[in-house]
Each structure stands twice: as C-alpha cells, then as structure tokens.
Amino acid sequence: CIRDRKIPLLIGIDAIHGNALYRGATVYPSPITIASTWDENNSYDVGIQTAHEMRSTGSHWAFTPNIDVMRDARWGRVGETFGEDPYLVTQMGTAMINGLQQGDFTGTNKVIACAKHLIAGSEPINGLNLSPMDISERTLNEIYLPPYKSAIEAGVFSIMAAHNEVNG
C-alpha cells in the first residue's frame, strides 16, 4: 500500500471453495456440485458467506466464480466449473457474483468478484490444460460468451483472462 499516493492494498484469494485457505473457514462443495442442485439461491448464499469470511480475514478480492462452460470431461479443471450447460453456468455464476459483491462490493462484508477465465479455456485440444482452442464463432457466441455477458450486466468488477490461444 502506498499511503502517500492513496493506492490501496487489495488482497485476493482463489475462493473456488470459499475462504478455504484459512483454518476454521467454511469449505464449500466444488462449484460443479453446487450447480447440480440447480438452486441459484444456494450459489448466492455461498457468495455471501464467502465474502463475509474473506473480509473477516482481511481479503478483498475473490478469484471466483469460474464461469467456463465445461465442454471436455478430460480437462483437469472440470470441478471448478458450474458444468456444461451455458444456461446453468450463467445463472449460477451470476448468483455467485451477486452474493460476493452484493451490489457495489463496498462495505465490510462484500468483496470484489472475478469472473474467470475469459474465454473458452474449457475446450482444449485433447483436454490438456493450456492447449489451444479451435472453435467456431457460433460456438463462441452461443456457448462461451453468455455467462460473461450476464456477469458484466450483473456488475462484476473484474474478469480474469484465460491463458489459452483461441483460433490462433
């Protein structure tokens, strides 16, 4: 933190399972398990509780939700996603964002949400993480972009870029 320049220190954690890096914090089921309930309120509530626990330990920025639409079961990060259905991923991810940020994310029990990983990181060639993607424009627009459109409309404050090459 640079006090004389008023640049705040932001502490972020990978909160896919809640604030699970801290002893005594609640460890929530994986997102794909939460998604299996088709209960948006559950996802929202997990977001609220995660934000509360994160702020109590000094964190401000949750590197979650993962709104990749899972397309290849061989991909090693399937459990971090809300599944293979673009509608379900959109609804559960948006609910999580709303729970984490609760409107504007300013306040003692709110955190910055980070929708990740833009874009199409979940359909790598042969299921290998970091592999390039070869997808059509239609697939991009109908499968991968809807969760991000909804996240932006919900006011997500940050989006994490993917590390994969798309149609390169």
Label each region the model flagged.
Residues R3-G168:
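Glycoside hydrolase catalytic-domain context in secreted enzymes
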